[in-house]
């Protein structure tokens, strides 16, 4: 019996843990080949190791799926392009991008530093743009593709000490 994502290739950012991991595992279980992107950074976005992405790839492969790991930063347009191109090179196409990468740098607005505000906006806003834009040319050439942008209710109703996260 055909699965919903048979033959599709999906990039999931922030897929080394949490919701991103579950999305990557679900996509693979539905037949997609998955590009598992994660820096392996802390929730604050510090540190870096590809082991989180590699662990999810190992889970997918152990379950009979197909996946590759990517440790690039969504904040870097060239790294975003490279993660899309890695999927195309390995699997022949890219069909969907799930922009799930995120960090937290909570702080009361009057105490928040520019660096903390900027770091969150770079991951959440520019990161989603960078990966989506990198995929757009392929989607146009293929005459189709899907962008999924994860968000939080903090952006709709706000939350204490999350001005940067809500933006």
Predicted feature locations:
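The beta1-alpha1 cofactor-binding region of Rossmann-like NAD(H)/NADP(H)-dependent oxidoreductases
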Residues: 71-85, 114
